[in-house]
Swiss-Prot record:
It comes from the Eukaryota. HAMAP family: Ribosomal_uL22_B (MF_01331_B). GO terms for molecular function: rRNA binding; structural constituent of ribosome. It is found in: Plastid, Chloroplast. Belongs to the universal ribosomal protein uL22 family. This is Large ribosomal subunit protein uL22c. This protein binds specifically to 23S rRNA. The globular domain of the protein is located near the polypeptide exit tunnel on the outside of the subunit, while an extended beta-hairpin is found that lines the wall of the exit tunnel in the center of the 70S ribosome. The gene is rpl22. The keyword Cell division does not apply. Keywords: Chloroplast, Plastid, Ribonucleoprotein, Ribosomal protein, RNA-binding, rRNA-binding.
Length: 127
């Protein structure tokens, strides 16, 4: 589920994915590699990474770039990842049947991923 519900200025585009079915610790391992990089470099890195977390993050980067291009008219070549964060979500609780009518709890972690893209030229003018 991808949501965006922020008041944005003309220089940044955001995308948020909630309840991604993986641990926040494992997703942070991928997010730390792309923070601060350009959009094209991020796409190349994520497509070659062997981790399971890279696919939902890649989809989210594409979504944030589409928001920047279509809604704000920014150029794809000037975008960079200004903010990328992973927060822990709720645990999906399930029961695993065991012998003699018993059951064990399974807690499956989820996480929320936020990507913010900024324009290099416009962010330099504002500072």
């Amino acid at each position: 589920m991808i949501k965006k519900n922020w008041i944005t200025t003309g220089t940044e585009a955001r995308a948020l994915a909630q309840n991604i079915s993986m641990s926040a610790y494992k997703a942070r391992r991928v997010i730390d590699q792309i923070r601060g990089r350009s959009y094209e470099e991020t796409i190349m890195i994520l497509e070659l990474m062997p981790y399971r977390a890279s696919f939902p993050i890649l989809k989210l980067v594409y979504s944030a770039a589409a928001n920047a291009i279509n809604n704000m008219g920014l150029s794809e070549a000037d975008l960079f990842i200004s903010k990328a964060e992973v927060n822990g979500g709720t645990f999906v609780k399930k029961l695993r049947p065991r012998a003699r009518g018993r059951s064990y709890a399974i807690k499956r972690p989820t996480c929320h991923i936020t990507i913010v893209l900024k324009d290099k030229d416009k962010s330099l003018l504002n500072e």
